[in-house]
A protein has these predicted regions:
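Single conserved hydrophobic/aromatic residue that forms the stacking wall/gate
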Residues: 1-10
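Fold-independent oxyanion-binding glycine-rich loops
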Residues: 26, 52, 160-161
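Periplasmic-binding protein-like
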Residues: 24-25, 99
Length: 184
């Protein structure tokens, strides 16, 4: 739950009482203030996870070095691909921090498998009665990022085919396309 400002965040000390593993992106403005997060960390015990809205290695590293976050957050779709996120993971590891990968998909699974300091696969926006809106049926072979992708041991498999391990289902992509643009 995001806050409008530091006064709102003080009310969020309930996270401490509940023993939550982290408090993610506490500020509604995108959470890019190093000073704001340093100040917040003085008033809550729950570890802070930010950098989801920080779009480059240098700024995310600055936030980690400044003590504004307890975790790094990386997303191959926005943070320089798998390579850019892997660099961020190494920076976090060098500072004794973990990186948590944002969102789901084959690239995210491969990134997590390549990082020894990542813990949780995000199957986002799910509920037992609602599908994951980010899990689009664009891959062949039954790949899924629905709740059932997590096995009985709490693990998620990593595709092992060439590239990211998945082949696109072009028939399904074309069937559900709303428009087509050809660049020449």
């Amino acid at each position: 739950s995001q806050s409008r400002g530091l006064g709102d965040v003080y009310k969020r000390q309930v996270c401490d009482e509940c023993g939550l593993y982290w408090y993610e992106d506490p500020y509604a403005d995108g959470g890019i203030s190093i000073h704001g997060h340093q100040t917040l960390k003085k008033h809550v015990k729950t570890p802070i996870l930010i950098t989801e809205f920080v779009r480059n290695l240098e700024t995310a590293t600055d936030m980690m070095v400044a003590g504004a976050t307890d975790f790094a957050r990386g997303d191959p779709d926005y943070d320089g691909g798998i390579t850019g996120c892997h660099k961020l993971a190494y920076a976090a590891e060098g500072l004794g921090m973990d990186i948590e990968v944002h969102s789901c998909g084959p690239a995210m699974r491969h990134l997590m498998a390549a990082c020894r300091n990542s813990n949780y696969y995000e199957v986002n926006l799910v509920h037992p009665k609602a599908d994951n809106a980010w899990s689009l049926p664009v891959y062949q072979g039954g790949y899924s990022d629905q709740l059932d992708c997590v096995d009985a041991d709490g693990c998620v498999s990593v595709p092992d085919g060439p590239g990211l391990g998945m082949a696109y289902d072009w028939a399904e992509i074309e069937r559900t396309a709303l428009d087509k643009v050809v660049l020449k």
